[in-house]
Structure formats: C-alpha cells, structure tokens
C-alpha cells in the first residue's frame, strides 16, 4: 500500500506550502494522478483524512484529477494505452514508452490567509 507514503508526501508538501504563504486554513488541495501511477484514489482519500486530523489540513478537501495514460511507439503510434500490463502498441505489438499519465503532482491549493 504505497498510498500511505504518497499521502504523507502530499501532506508534507502542502503543509510547507501553507506555512510559506502564512495560511490560517487550507480549504482544498488538488492533485493530478497519472493512470500508470497505480494509485487507488479511495485509499489515498482515506489516508489523507486520517493523516490530516491533527494539523492545518484538517477538514480540507482532497481533489483528485485522473490523468489518462498516453504512450508512443517506434512505429509512430501515439495515444492511449489499451493494455496497461504490457504497454504493447495496438498497431505493431512493440512495447511503448509512456509520455503522460505516470506522475503524481500537487497542482493547486486553496488557502485562507
């Protein structure tokens, strides 16, 4: 369950950002999660709620935006990844290279100062 470590990292980043901006309250944080990051959004939400009970993020909303996987192949194909387990190109069968949908990124925060 790597959602715990992801939630911890997101919370630490959000707390540091809130501190740097003299926030009195954090209303929400928005996170983009790539399809290939293999994160369970429900588990991440749960971990976020548990880990924010005793800090400035208590009561804040975690907004998750799913980013679809996009890959490209030597044959020229660029698009969705139909088979996430092998990343095989739908045109030629070669293994594709992911170009989008791998990352986890804290995009925005809504705060009260």
From Swiss-Prot:
Zn(2+) binds at residues 73, 75, 89, 92. InterPro entries: HypA/HybF (IPR000688). It holds the Pfam family HypA. The keyword Protease does not apply. Ni(2+) binds at residue 2. Keywords: Metal-binding, Nickel, Zinc. GO terms for biological process: protein maturation; protein modification process. This is Hydrogenase maturation factor HypA. It comes from Methanocella arvoryzae (strain DSM 22066 / NBRC 105507 / MRE50).
């Amino acid at each position: 369950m790597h959602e715990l470590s992801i939630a911890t990292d997101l919370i630490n980043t959000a707390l540091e950002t809130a501190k740097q901006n003299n926030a009195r309250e954090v209303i929400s944080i928005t996170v983009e999660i790539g399809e290939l990051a293999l994160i369970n959004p429900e588990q991440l939400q749960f971990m976020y709620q548990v880990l924010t009970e005793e800090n400035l993020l208590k009561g804040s909303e975690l907004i998750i935006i799913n980013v679809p996987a996009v890959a490209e192949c030597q044959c020229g194909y660029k698009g969705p990844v139909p088979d996430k387990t092998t990343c095989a190109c739908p045109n030629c069968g070669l293994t594709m290279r992911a170009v989008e949908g791998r990352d986890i990124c804290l995009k925005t925060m809504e705060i009260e100062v």
